[in-house]
Amino acid sequence: MAKTIYVLNGPNLNMLGTREPDTYGHANLADVEQLCAETAKNFGLAADCRQSNREGELIDFIHEAHAKNAAGIVINAGGYSHTSIALHDALVAVKIPTVEVHISNIHAREDFRHHSFTAKAAFASLSGFGIDGYRLAINGLAAKIGAVDPSNKVKS
């Protein structure tokens, strides 16, 4: 059975493809989830993709990842990245290798987006690569946990 990574998307990411396409692009959440599933599969991993507009539900997903011994977490907490100490604390509590992703470059946007609580709980943070940031995050996570791409027998 494949090790599972959780891919967690926060508020408004269900609106990808229609919400501010100049900032977030034209890909929708299903495109992101497909990209994550395919990338994870390349490393013999399974991607369990979740989205919620509610902070508490995202925390429940993090706790579930811990309870199910998930190998890692990729999280785009959306606006909660900049405000949620509770998400930070949940990620720290579970001690699961985590990568933070943002589709847009949060440092080139409004000042309030420049600080991320979730980044402080992650071993890496990617920002500004569009949805390709998810692929990069999974590659980095695979390297961190020692997953190997079976197509070329090389670690990520």
From Swiss-Prot:
The keyword Lyase applies. Keywords: Amino-acid biosynthesis, Aromatic amino acid biosynthesis, Lyase. The record marks R19 as: Transition state stabilizer. It comes from the Bacteria. Substrate binds at N76, H82, D89, I103, S104, R113. The active site is at Y24, H102. Pathway: Metabolic intermediate biosynthesis; chorismate biosynthesis; chorismate from D-erythrose 4-phosphate and phosphoenolpyruvate: step 3/7. It is an enzyme of class 4 (lyase). Pfam families: DHquinase_II. GO terms for molecular function: 3-dehydroquinate dehydratase activity. It catalyses: 3-dehydroquinate = 3-dehydroshikimate + H2O. The keyword Amino-acid biosynthesis applies. Its EC number is 4.2.1.10. Homododecamer. Belongs to the type-II 3-dehydroquinase family. Catalyzes a trans-dehydration via an enolate intermediate. This is 3-dehydroquinate dehydratase. It comes from Nitrobacter winogradskyi (strain ATCC 25391 / DSM 10237 / CIP 104748 / NCIMB 11846 / Nb-255). The gene is aroQ.
